[in-house]
Amino acid sequence: MTLRVLGVDPGLTRCGIGVVDIEKNRRATMVAVGVVGTSAELTLDKRLLVIAQAIDEWLDRHEPDVVAVERVFSQMNVSTVMGVAQASGVVIAAAARRGIPVALHTPSEVKAAVTGSGTANKDAVTKLVTKILRLDAPPKPADAADALALALTHAWRAGSGMGAASGNSSLTPAQKAWADAEAKARRKR
């Protein structure tokens, strides 16, 4: 059984999208990769619409079993975080409309899964994604490589077997702590 994962490195300026097929033996093959760009001159609603339309097209064309999205962190500046969060929301909603499970992975989880180090730089991630997927050339820009890395991370962390399509199966301790904290915060409201 092959698992198809659509990975998304969300962003308003550049949104990386990659589709990977992963076999039970963890062998991965790139199906497609690209970047959706939006102009800063467009209004926010128009930028999100461009991303939404592209994501809809990718989901319908590639029919993934699961969507893996980079989890937003507040370490960045506020305007960057907002843009990433808004783009993430568009992606998550598009998948939800189709009944496709969504999993969120932190940048550190992705780096660790692909390179073995949670502090690896973008060049190391790109180099290993290129090697793992047996590509002739590195995916460019880095957002494209990051999207493929997200897809690989989800498949490997969730296990490419039966429960892999579920966004909540096989959570890491950090993901479990995060999910528990979010659930606790929701109960307090």
Swiss-Prot record:
GO molecular function: crossover junction DNA endonuclease activity; DNA binding; magnesium ion binding
EC numbers, comma separated: 3.1.21.10
Catalytic site: 9, 70, 143
Bias type Basic and acidic residues, positions: 179-189
Enzyme class label: hydrolase
Region of interest (Disordered), residue spans: 162-189
Compartment(s) of residence: Cytoplasm
Biased segments, Low complexity type: 162-178
SUPFAM superfamilies noted in UniProt: Ribonuclease H-like
Keywords recorded for this protein, A-Z: Cytoplasm, DNA damage, DNA recombination, DNA repair, DNA-binding, Endonuclease, Hydrolase, Magnesium, Metal-binding, Nuclease
Residues the entry annotates as binding Mg(2+) 1: 9, 143
Any Gene Ontology biological process: DNA repair
Note on cofactor: Binds 2 Mg(2+) ion per subunit.
UniProt-annotated binding residues for Mg(2+) 2: 70
Entry-linked HAMAP family: RuvC
UniProt similarity note: Belongs to the RuvC family.
Quaternary structure annotation from Swiss-Prot or TrEMBL: Homodimer which binds Holliday junction (HJ) DNA. The HJ becomes 2-fold symmetrical on binding to RuvC with unstacked arms; it has a different conformation from HJ DNA in complex with RuvA. In the full resolvosome a probable DNA-RuvA(4)-RuvB(12)-RuvC(2) complex forms which resolves the HJ.
Protein task: The RuvA-RuvB-RuvC complex processes Holliday junction (HJ) DNA during genetic recombination and DNA repair. Endonuclease that resolves HJ intermediates. Cleaves cruciform DNA by making single-stranded nicks across the HJ at symmetrical positions within the homologous arms, yielding a 5'-phosphate and a 3'-hydroxyl group; requires a central core of homology in the junction. The consensus cleavage sequence is 5'-(A/T)TT(C/G)-3'. Cleavage occurs on the 3'-side of the TT dinucleotide at the point of strand exchange.
UniProt protein name: Crossover junction endodeoxyribonuclease RuvC
Gene, per the UniProt record: ruvC
